[in-house]
């Protein structure tokens, strides 16, 4: 039983046509004899034959695992049968059974031999040994290279719309629901009768009054925002009618901050925990004194003939952005009209600076405390890096074709972003270019979060799937391939570390959040209950 290369070319050509890849099919048609085969076999080969053959090969590889060396059927492992067996795992098993011939000795290619002879001096020998050591360290750092880990759900949550983990306690999760209630929960692994399982214990319920929204008149009052202070001792909750409440980590109410009249979209604490800034969907931004609960500044930016002013009773205009950020204990930035970013001091009513460059609403603002640079992302599909005292961006990254939903710093020289165009991109400030790329065609990304240690990046797709990318492994491969060279010819693929799929169709994801240890992710779904998955 065999298949020729020309027959395989024909099946690939048929597959390209069936999937609508017309350009690829045309290229294959020009370079092979597929049209001759099509005349002979078109009526006898059904649709999807190539996929069917690959699936049968995967099944054959798995069935081989169930038969021992003597030909007897092995005992069935229920846990093994419940797991997904995919193409990557089948190829890995085949590679272990039939390893490739090493290119050494008489199997070494002539070109390799010549290059080895040309590089026999001491310096080049040391360089080759260093490169080999780097490659070996990469391979040994991931024993399951090629495998995609399937994440397991450990705890079911209620029908949540947002969630955030305590920044210092890896077991405490705050999550908000549609019924104006947020909850503080502790999630720990326990041991009972020799079996380990995860247990969720409710610490407190953080309740808002069930009131109508002042702007929309909606009868719902769901929790739209949650924000822990940097020391993890306090949390702010925001709801649809604009009310903010301040709580301690045991659930005791500390203060009620009531000035907004529209759903809250962003809340940020300053480093010392004395002030917060909040923003609602009507572009109203308020600076609060946390200790007294009083309003220190009130900004309501709108466009009037190309300029921005503070206006009263402003509503109905388009969103200027959905994020705010502190750049110091007494300085912060907020979105302004026409894609501008305004810089304010807590003691000044007028802006002290204006950053111009974006041409759409601001979706992300994130300040790096180490290099003192501000990262911004916009619905115009661009990311920009700003340096204090300069109104023009020092870096501008183009590549996304739709709105950017998440952007984060990866160390001091790189930023990672994801967009509704389905792509995840890693950028370098020093080289001012794209370093790595991952694209899932046709599936928009709704959320993205980086782990606290910066080693993994989780993205949530519209179809309910969560992908976790391995940034640590990507960084190692990048150093091995390019070293300290400035030129990057082609972006690297971003290694996929793990994946998790919703069990319900058409169940997109509202929100993601990492715990501080980087070993758990909370997921908020549109239809079913929320989940906590273990990494």
Curated annotation (Swiss-Prot):
Any one GO MF annotation of this record: transcription corepressor activity
Alphabetized UniProt keyword annotations: Chromatin regulator, Nucleus, Phosphoprotein, Repeat, WD repeat
Location in the cell: Nucleus
Keyword Mitochondrion: no
Annotated GO biological process: cellular response to starvation; chromatin organization; DNA damage response; negative regulation of meiotic nuclear division; positive regulation of stress-activated MAPK cascade; regulation of DNA-templated transcription; regulation of transcription by RNA polymerase II
Ranges where the LisH domain occurs: 4-36
Subunit details: Homotetramer. Interacts with SIR4 N-terminal domain. Interacts with a complex composed of SIN3 and RPD3. Identified in the Set3C complex with HOS2, HST1, SNT1, CPR1, HOS4/YIL112W and SET3.
UniProt domain comment: The LisH domain mediates tetramerization and interaction with SNT1.
Protein name, per record: SIR4-interacting protein SIF2
Natural source organism: Saccharomyces cerevisiae (strain ATCC 204508 / S288c) (Baker's yeast)
